[in-house]
């Protein structure tokens, strides 16, 4: 009975945690504010449908608006929009009901991106389509604008094969007799409330992940910043020499990594309370008369592949959202990746990692069963104490403590494996919903995506049957309270219903873990019976 009760306590705690997490993520939706928006960034929100150019390497396809040179659309060619879609996943887009853009420019006293005149440079290019060839090591896409006083601005997008980072390079030539002062900025803008077509997991509390802004600075390696904070004008203003700014969602990220020109300013802003902005602004860059200056920054548009992000910028790989158990999820993911490199199937890798985890916790499991067996053996003595001192609860507690000390039993020993296994289980959950490598990863037969729910609910039903079997071999026949007995008998049905929406990979882990529990329980109890 103790095994069964502990098992359901574990499941209940996990589901309760997920429900709380889903509630927390929805708290900001109705919050509003009447505070004014910083006018410095008003011009960024002007919608100009000017000429566009198209840039493509083997993994990303970009659409750049020549009015300002912003990246208004980005498709990830190696990732499908949905499991059965032939369209690539569109990360950045500019539509009537949703905007997600990566913007950059030169602002300040002499910058062409003017907040005062509400205008931006209209660049030109020698063609509309730029594609990285099969044998080319680099694609350079220059766009050009010349100011009225003859200053030449050349903005170049640099793409490399099989890379999601894009180098943005400004080449500013100042032919005048006056110095020019300007700042480079890079920012990401996104509509806060998702349209229905993008909000695919809105009804699934088990697949909720962080969506919002994030940054890295001198003082913080990685810090999330919720959209509701930006919408309520609780804005950032951080001076830092290192770091980056980003917007995150499940599996994918867009990030600006500024060049180290001194103290950059990280900021956030809200446009009409429905659009969030996070960005950076460099210190003043001086361009002397009759000289040129090269100003660089880097843009990441792609999946959260940790080993690649780590090479692009320090701490950028931390954007993979493993929640508060990242210190467990990261080594688990590395182990899972090693297993996958050997087996070649993520599902079988999950099965194998389950055996490994349960093997490592076997000594605790064994200690749990031994502790429970001793507790059952003491039940007659415990009952005798309760009857003898029925009118003195304090005396009952004292006598029971003395009994536990005499028999060398820890009454809480049976709960220890729960507190060991629950973090492992939760970290695996975070890993499954946060690792892009598992997105659309097939297993066998009808399971084509281990990161999403079972479309036919077969795995949750099997999981429920294993819970029911654990309940039966633990036996509820000796429960005297009829209500408690009914509740315990109904628990497998309740948790089967909860697990209908869980990722298939997590349900698979739970099934295998339950089967291991059954085998271990039979083996340990059998040995205990023999040794009596």
Curated annotation (Swiss-Prot):
GO biological process per UniProt: protein insertion into membrane; protein transport
The keyword Coiled coil is annotated on this UniProt entry: no
Compartments, record wording: Cell membrane
Record membrane topology: Multi-pass membrane protein
Transmembrane segments: 7-27, 336-356, 413-433, 450-470, 492-512
Record-level Gene Ontology MF annotations: membrane insertase activity
Pfam families for the chain: 60KD_IMP (PF02096), YidC_periplas (PF14849)
Keywords of the record: Cell membrane, Chaperone, Membrane, Protein transport, Transmembrane, Transmembrane helix, Transport
Highest taxon of source: Bacteria
GO terms for cellular component: plasma membrane
Reported function: Required for the insertion and/or proper folding and/or complex formation of integral membrane proteins into the membrane. Involved in integration of membrane proteins that insert both dependently and independently of the Sec translocase complex, as well as at least some lipoproteins. Aids folding of multispanning membrane proteins.
Subunit text: Interacts with the Sec translocase complex via SecD. Specifically interacts with transmembrane segments of nascent integral membrane proteins during membrane integration.
PANTHER family documented for this protein: CYTOCHROME C OXIDASE ASSEMBLY PROTEIN COX18, MITOCHONDRIAL, OXA1
Family the UniProt entry places it in: Belongs to the OXA1/ALB3/YidC family. Type 1 subfamily.
Name of the protein this chain belongs to: Membrane protein insertase YidC
Originating organism: Buchnera aphidicola subsp. Acyrthosiphon pisum (strain 5A)
Biological classification of the source: Bacteria, Pseudomonadati, Pseudomonadota, Gammaproteobacteria, Enterobacterales
Gene that specifies this protein: yidC
């Amino acid at each position: 009975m103790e095994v069964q009760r502990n098992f359901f306590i574990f499941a209940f705690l996990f589901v309760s945690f997920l429900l709380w997490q889903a509630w927390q993520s929805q708290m900001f939706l109705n919050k509003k504010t009447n505070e004014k928006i910083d006018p410095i960034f008003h011009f960024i929100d002007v919608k100009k449908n000017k000429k566009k150019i198209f840039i493509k390497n083997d993994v990303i396809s970009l659409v750049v608006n020549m009015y300002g040179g912003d990246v208004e659309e980005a498709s990830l060619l190696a990732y499908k929009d949905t499991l059965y879609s032939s369209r690539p996943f569109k990360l950045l887009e500019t539509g009537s009901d949703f905007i997600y853009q990566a913007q950059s420019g030169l602002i300040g006293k002499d910058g062409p991106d003017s907040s005062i005149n509400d205008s931006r440079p209209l660049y030109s290019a020698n063609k509309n389509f730029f594609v990285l060839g099969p044998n080319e090591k680099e694609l350079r896409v220059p766009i050009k604008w010349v100011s009225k006083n003859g200053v030449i601005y050349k903005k170049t997008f640099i793409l490399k094969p099989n890379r999601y980072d894009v180098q943005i390079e400004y080449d500013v030539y100042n032919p005048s007799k006056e110095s020019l002062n300007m700042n480079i900025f890079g920012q990401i803008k996104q509509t806060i409330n998702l349209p229905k077509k993008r909000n695919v997991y809105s009804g699934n509390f088990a697949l909720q992940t962080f969506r919002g802004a994030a940054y890295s600075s001198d003082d913080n390696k990685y810090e999330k910043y919720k959209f509701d904070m930006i919408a309520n004008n609780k804005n950032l203003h951080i001076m830092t020499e290192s770091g980056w700014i980003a917007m995150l969602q499940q599996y994918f990220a867009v990030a600006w990594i500024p060049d180290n020109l001194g103290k950059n300013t990280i900021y956030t802003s809200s446009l009409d309370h429905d659009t969030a902005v996070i960005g950076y602004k460099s210190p003043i860059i001086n361009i002397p008369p009759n000289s040129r200056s090269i100003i660089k920054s880097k843009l990441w548009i792609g999946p959260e592949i940790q080993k690649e992000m780590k090479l692009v910028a320090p701490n950028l790989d931390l954007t993979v959202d493993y929640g508060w158990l990242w210190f467990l999820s990261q080594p688990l993911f590395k182990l899972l990746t090693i297993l996958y490199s050997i087996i070649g199937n993520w599902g079988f890798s999950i099965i194998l990692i389950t055996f490994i985890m349960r093997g490592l916790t076997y000594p605790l499991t064994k200690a749990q069963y031994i502790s429970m067996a001793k507790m059952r053996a003491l039940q007659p003595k415990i009952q005798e104490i309760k009857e003898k001192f029925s009118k003195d609860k304090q005396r009952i507690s004292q006598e029971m403590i003395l009994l536990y000390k005499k028999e060398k039993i820890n009454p809480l020993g049976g709960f220890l494996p729960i507190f060991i296994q629950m973090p492992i289980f939760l970290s695996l959950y975070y890993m499954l919903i946060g690792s892009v490598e598992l997105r659309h990863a097939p297993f066998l037969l009808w399971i084509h995506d281990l990161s999403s729910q079972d479309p036919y609910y077969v795995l949750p039903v099997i999981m429920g049957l294993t819970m029911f079997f654990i309940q039966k071999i633990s036996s509820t026949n000796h429960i005297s309270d009829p209500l408690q007995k009914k509740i315990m008998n109904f628990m497998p049905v309740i948790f089967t219903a909860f697990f209908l929406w869980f990722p298939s990979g997590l349900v698979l882990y739970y099934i295998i873990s339950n089967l291991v529990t059954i085998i271990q329980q039979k083996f340990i109890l059998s040995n205990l019976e023999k040794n009596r």
